[in-house]
């Protein structure tokens, strides 16, 4: 499909710079393409009323790390140059894939000293060698530190990598360290938050428990590639970024049991959906799964396991708007976004949410 078919105009003032307080007071647009009235306006705290006892919410429990690093590049003894790197996928105890700026001036073999003005952190120098250079500013960094010691060093000098549409308007601050993290995050490794999960509060969890809604947790480490623009003119020519994660045998069995009892699988966020669909066979059975997924979902895709999706409002021309268009219908989602814009919904990571029913007709 032509990528420009997924374009729409979004006024700048619709981009949320801070989350709603409390989190579950955010607005919730319910989209049911097969209902007589496809769109209805609610709040996230109303979520239990749209679910049934025996349904299962699937959350992504990845935890955002301070993956934005600033440093000084050194080459052949020459003077240093300021560079930045956003880590996006760990490929070994001491090696990370990253997006570096300015990418054109970085070469294989360069040494980069990360930290404030290239200084050492308390547990040692956070230095790395550019091991490999790829496309679009992507590099492979081999750090001198390894394992938990490397993790500690990154935590000491790194910054939360706010999405570019927020970072362009204000700097990251201490509040973001809490705001840009779900309350159930536990598996470190994400560069971006699974933002649909940001709306959940202890009070909402309690209400869901009382309604008999199950909670299941999977892990997909969201990478910086989620913010990369689609540069191709046709979806067939777009290469999807890879993200690593896993579905345990216990979770797979639990979700299959939910389906067998007639319950629905409700994914909280596109990351949970992409992971569950990667783990599902053609019959819809979910199997234990671990690895890197590059699943790219566009209209025409047949969903195998997921029945409902809770997700925020996405960028024009993005792979995520393509995904929701595949899930609830191309025309329905264009109408939903037009409604959201005209009625003041807040967009993107800190914005409001939508609850989507899968289009079956």
Swiss-Prot record:
Major enzyme class: transferase
Catalytic activity: 7-aminomethyl-7-carbaguanosine(34) in tRNA + S-adenosyl-L-methionine = epoxyqueuosine(34) in tRNA + adenine + L-methionine + 2 H(+)
Annotated localization: Cytoplasm
Keywords assigned: Cytoplasm, Queuosine biosynthesis, S-adenosyl-L-methionine, Transferase
InterPro entries xrefs: QueA (IPR003699), QueA_dom1 (IPR042118), QueA_dom2 (IPR042119), QueA_sf (IPR036100)
A GO MF term: S-adenosylmethionine:tRNA ribosyltransferase-isomerase activity
Assembly and oligomerization: Monomer.
PANTHER family: S-ADENOSYLMETHIONINE:TRNA RIBOSYLTRANSFERASE-ISOMERASE (PTHR30307:SF0)
Name recorded for this polypeptide: S-adenosylmethionine:tRNA ribosyltransferase-isomerase
Gene: queA
